[in-house]
UniProtKB/Swiss-Prot annotation:
The chain crosses the membrane at residues 27-47, 51-71, 87-107, 135-155, 174-194, 198-218, 239-259. InterPro entries: Cation/H_exchanger_TM, CPA1_transporter, Na+/solute_symporter_sf. GO terms for molecular function: antiporter activity. This is Putative SLC9B1-like protein SLC9B1P1. One of its GO terms (cellular component) is membrane. Keywords: Membrane, Transmembrane, Transmembrane helix. It comes from the Eukaryota. Belongs to the monovalent cation:proton antiporter 1 (CPA1) transporter (TC 2.A.36) family. The keyword Cell cycle does not apply. Its main location: membrane. GO terms for biological process: inorganic cation transmembrane transport; proton transmembrane transport.
Amino acid sequence: MVLQENGYGVEEDIPTLLMAASSMDDLLAITGFNTCLSIVFYSGGMINNAIASLRNVCISLLAGIVLGFFVRYFPSEDQKKITLKRGFLVLITFVSAVLGSQPIGLHGSGGLCTLVLHFIEWTKWSQEKMKVQKIITNVWDIFQPLLFGLVGAEVSVSLLESNIVGISVSTLSLALCVRILNIYLLMCFAGFSFKEKIFIALAWMPKATVQAVLGPLALETARVSTPHLETYAKDVMTVAFLAIMITAPNGALLMGILGPKMLTRHYDPSKIKLQLSTLEHH
């Protein structure tokens, strides 16, 4: 988003591509996690659990579509302070979807619902979406430390077993290498330059938010329903913790360094603001 605001890769729609693909990646991760969670922690046959998980996914998708269309057209565009109202409505809807999915047994499906809701509403809004995004970003900056703080509180570095850490780091490294290579090969058919393909492949490396949300969910479910599986749930937390610690800062650093060097800058926001202020004075 910072690169987009500064005009890098805008003409090629690279920031939009990265955010859209990230949403689809999160969608796949949440769906797969919910399916595995149902199979591991809940009683019944594997087929029944898989069907129940798919049912929950369908309910989440349907709820996200309905809420998305609601937010698209309400409040109406003729109202005052429409951006502020839309921003708070989106935040309330997101929080309600996540918290409301827990009491009705749709564990983890709230995140899937918010992703679909976010996609549906964003396709309607044009000029206001960046302003609404700014409001959500400011709120996220407040709650983000709490989310990652909870993950860090559940993982005791002194109690981490060396073999678990080694296996986790090796698995993450292998997965990242395969991921980066596959993305680069796919971008070869999309018409991007060599530098742009390298940047896009590396920009998909960071993993943090989804891992921070789903990791504690597995541990919480194990503590409540199946305490004998708590050890394995802690291993999941360890992998999530290492994924955040390794990929998030390094990915952000690479994007910050390589973005201005590998992407074409099509406009300078500071110059545009200066020109607008000059026109207003005249």
